[in-house]
Each structure stands twice: as C-alpha cells, then as structure tokens.
A protein has these predicted regions:
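A structural motif
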Residues: 67, 171-173, 254
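Short glycine-rich catalytic loops that host catalytic nucleophiles or stabilize transition states
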Residues: 178-181, 250, 283
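NAD(P)-dependent dehydrogenase/reductase Rossmann-like domain
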Residues: 158, 200, 239, 253, ...
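A short, acidic, amphipathic alpha-helical segment used as a generic capping/interface helix at domain edges
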Residues: 237-254
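FabD-like malonyl-/acyl-CoA
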Residues: 4-127, 256-284
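Alpha/beta catalytic cores of group-transfer enzymes, especially the acyltransferase/condensing modules
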Residues: 22-26, 85-237
C-alpha cells in the first residue's frame, strides 16, 4: 500500500492532518492524495506536503518513545521538531508553507538552481567553490550530504561555471545532475527570505524538546530552544551539515536509525558510512 493510501485509510491520521492544517489556504489532504503534480513541484506546496507525510508515517507506524535523538535533513528539521514535541504540528505546517512562499518569491523562476556533485573529494569541492567565487560568480555549498555527495546552489551562470571547472580539470569519476526543485536552498540568494522567516519564527512558541535534536547547521545535539530557533533561521542560507550529522551518529554508537520521510535518500546516505552499515536502518 502506498503512503497516500495508508494516510487516506487511517481516519485518526486524516483527522489529525485536517485539524492541524485548518489555517492553510489550501486542502492539505487533497494535495497529498491527488496533487496535481505541477502544484506539488512548487516549494510552497511541496514543503507542507512533505512535512505532513513524514509526520503521518510516524503516527501510522506508531514509533515508540525509545528514540534517543532526532534529526531532519533541510525541511526535515521541522518534522524532527514536531516529533520531539518542540513545535506544534499546526505551527510547523504554517511555518513551512510561508517558508516555501518566501523562497519561491526570493528567486525568479528559472534563474538559479542546485547541482548535485558526485564522487568529488570534499577538499576538491571547496577548491572548486573558491575558484568559481574568485570570479564574478557566487556558488554556495548548499548541502554536505555524505562522502562523495555534495550539493551546490547558485545562479545558472554559477552552476555552469562549476560544470566547466569539472570538465576543464578532468575529474573523470565526477558526475553531476541538477536537483528537481523550483528554487535553490541553503544559499545567499535567500537572504531576504531569511529575514522574513526570522520575523515569523519569533511569533511561534517553541518548547524544550522531549528528545534532543541535531540541527543542520550545528551537527550536534541540543535541547536549547534559542539555539534550535536560530538554527532554523541560519539553515536557510547556510550549509546543511548532514555528513557530519551522520558521523556524529556513528561515533556515538547509534545502532538503529528510523527514517520516516518519503523515499530512501536518507538511508542510502547513511549506508555510505561503514560504521552505520552495521546499524539497523529502517525505512517506514
């Protein structure tokens, strides 16, 4: 049974999602169930849909209270905060909906993007960024996902400059692919959106989490509310340190990792660390 069917067949979850999303100006259940795909591709709708799906999966699978730490990649950090009872689900939905709108309006459509760079050493990634930024271009290290998996963000000309650098320097094993997102994330292009998001976050109540969370920009656990809130603001324009987050989990002998998000991306990245290969990696 696909996740859409699982959600629709569970009245408790449907009621929970409906209640939490009543302040949104669109039908969240209908969006998750029926799309359309064109609407789901817009980040202002994709973000609440992904958040809701992640929380729905956690509720359907009835994840117990034995979780010792929680973390979420990029948008997933909001799901982690909801799961840790640091942030009300309804507040999180409103936040990510507005976050998506701010991001969508910050960058003119088709002018910028995100580039996945595979099989390039981290030192070479930084060298490329330095070289590209020494010209009139600006490329940002959007997401440090895992060993050999880096994501860059910037204007189209900066993306092209990175591709040219790779070709000119004969990185034969290195492959690139564009991320299918309507706007780039975790980059300086979102500076204005960041200011608006900060204003909005200051109107929302955050509670001390019942489970420590590893924010994207810290890569280590915290239960400090101010630190958590500031991390949500900072991550919009700064690098997501996911590789370091996974490294923390492996070094601190986290033996079971449960992924409540859509797809297998998180677990596939976790498997790149030898220590985590031995962990129980469970996709819900």
């Amino acid at each position: 049974m696909c996740i859409r069917d699982s959600i629709n067949s569970n009245k408790e979850v449907v009621d929970y999602l409906s209640s939490a999303s009543k302040n949104l100006d669109f039908d969240l259940i209908e969006l998750i169930s029926s799309g359309p795909e064109e609407k789901l591709n817009l980040t202002e709708f994709a973000q609440p849909a992904i958040l809701a799906t992640s929380i729905a999966i956690a509720k359907i699978k009835n994840i117990n209270s034995e979780i010792s730490v929680t973390a979420g990649l990029s948008l997933g950090e909001y799901s982690a905060l909801v799961f840790a009872n640091c942030l009300e689900f309804s507040d999180a939905l409103k936040l990510v909906n507005v976050r998506g709108q701010l991001m969508q309006s910050a960058v003119p459509e088709g002018t910028a993007g995100m580039l996945v760079v595979l099989n390039m050493e981290l030192a070479d990634v930084y060298k490329m960024i330095e070289k590209v930024n020494s010209s009139e271009e600006e490329i940002n290290f959007s997401t440090d996902n895992a060993e050999g998996v880096s994501v860059l963000a910037g204007k189209n000309s900066s993306i092209d400059a990175c591709k040219k650098y790779i070709a000119d320097n004969d990185f034969r094993r290195v492959k690139t692919q564009m991320v299918q997102m309507s706007v780039p994330s975790h980059c300086s292009l979102l500076s204005e959106a960041q200011k608006e998001l900060e204003n909005l976050l200051n109107t929302v109540e955050f509670k001390v989490p019942e489970i420590p969370i590893i924010p994207n920009v810290l890569a280590k656990p915290t239960s400090d509310v101010d630190e958590i809130k500031n991390s949500l603001i900072t991550q919009l324009t700064n690098t997501v340190r996911w590789r370091e987050t996974l490294k923390y989990l492996s070094e601190n002998k986290i033996h079971h990792i449960i992924d409540a998000g859509p797809g297998k991306t998180i677990l596939n990245m976790a498997r790149k660390l030898k220590e985590l290969e031995k962990s129980s990696l469970l996709e819900l």
